[in-house]
């Protein structure tokens, strides 16, 4: 193909084909996906068996979409089973290693030390490991700061992608993300289709602005379903602009009470059919039925 790779991307490809283990890191829009796809193609040409994995179901799904290859969660890659004592154990370990010649892990910043330890124990002798992620992201919820610590150890090759490509430069989200990473304040007066800043004087005004954006303005401007396409984030739980109050406000406007729809009250929270909920734990055994009768497997976070 006529694919163009920047110098640091070419360096990453060469390193991936020559080193036993490497880290590929860089912020959004720096070409990590293009680099990974190039590496996968060359590894396939060498007839090597490849596995792709990520720490969460959503990250694995995204990895599958952008590479065109199946990606699994690390737990599924290692094959989680219940022991006779009821504990979760991995069937792939030192005694039963993974069969792959190359394993590519994405979103490494989200992996804690316990999961990384289990993964490394399951890698067969002579296999190649490629770790990809953004070192500037928050560390894992569990113990450890894997990608940062490995980079600081200076024991394996690290390729840092810094160049923001032209297509990514058109996204103000990506531009501002890099500004923040470099300690610069974004220009909040500049508005674009994917980033704009609205200032309100009170938390109550902020909450109603969020509701109006969610229910009316964003769906109308972008022709999207607010339930499936818009996610509201708040830095706090409490207060008029916190997640608890915002959830109640949005529910009252988007999914109000209807005697024809069942609802259940748990404490101070009312759940209704049609509410948007957050799945916080992967469940590979759960089968869900779609309206047309087809079955689908798994619910992932």
Question: Where do the language-model regions lie?
Answer:
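Short gly/ser/thr-rich secondary-structure transition/capping motifs
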Residues: 4, 82-91, 259-261
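A structural connector/turn signal
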Residues: 92-93, 118, 266, 295
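Conserved helicase motor core of SF1/SF2 NTP-dependent helicases
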Residues: 23, 38, 42-48, 54-66, ...
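N-terminal pre-P-loop "Q-motif" helix
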Residues: 3-18
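Conserved lysine of the Walker
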Residues: 32
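Conserved helicase motor core of P-loop NTPases
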Residues: 1, 15, 132-298
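Walker A (P-loop) phosphate-binding loop of P-loop NTPases
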Residues: 29
């Amino acid at each position: 193909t006529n694919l163009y790779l920047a110098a640091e991307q070419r360096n990453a490809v060469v390193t991936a084909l020559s080193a036993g283990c490497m880290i590929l890191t860089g912020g959004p829009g720096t070409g990590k996906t293009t680099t990974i796809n190039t590496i996968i193609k060359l590894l396939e040409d060498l007839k090597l068996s490849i596995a792709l994995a990520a720490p969460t179901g959503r990250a694995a799904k995204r990895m599958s979409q952008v590479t065109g290859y199946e990606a699994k969660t690390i737990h599924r890659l290692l094959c989680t089973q219940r022991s006779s004592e009821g504990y979760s154990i991995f069937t792939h370990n030192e005694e039963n290693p993974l069969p792959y010649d190359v394993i590519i892990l994405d979103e490494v910043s989200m992996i804690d030390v316990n999961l990384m330890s289990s993964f490394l124990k399951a890698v067969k002798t002579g296999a190649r490991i490629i770790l990809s992620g953004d070192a500037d992201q928050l560390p894992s919820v569990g113990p450890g700061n894997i990608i940062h610590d490995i980079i600081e150890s200076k024991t394996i090759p690290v390729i840092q992608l810094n160049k923001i490509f032209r297509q990514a430069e058109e996204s103000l989200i990506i531009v501002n993300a890099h500004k923040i990473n470099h300690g610069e304040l974004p220009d909040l007066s500049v508005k674009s289709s994917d980033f704009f800043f609205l200032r309100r004087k009170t938390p109550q005004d902020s909450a109603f602005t969020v509701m109006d954006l969610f229910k009316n303005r964003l769906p109308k401007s972008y022709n999207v379903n607010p339930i499936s396409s818009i996610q509201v984030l708040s830095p706090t739980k409490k207060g008029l602009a916190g997640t608890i109050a915002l959830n109640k406000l949005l529910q009252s406007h988007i999914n109000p009470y209807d005697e024809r729809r069942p609802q259940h009250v748990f404490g101070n929270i009312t759940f209704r059919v049609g509410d948007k909920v957050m799945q916080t734990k992967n469940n590979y055994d759960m089968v869900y039925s779609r309206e047309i009768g087809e079955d689908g497997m798994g619910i992932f976070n």
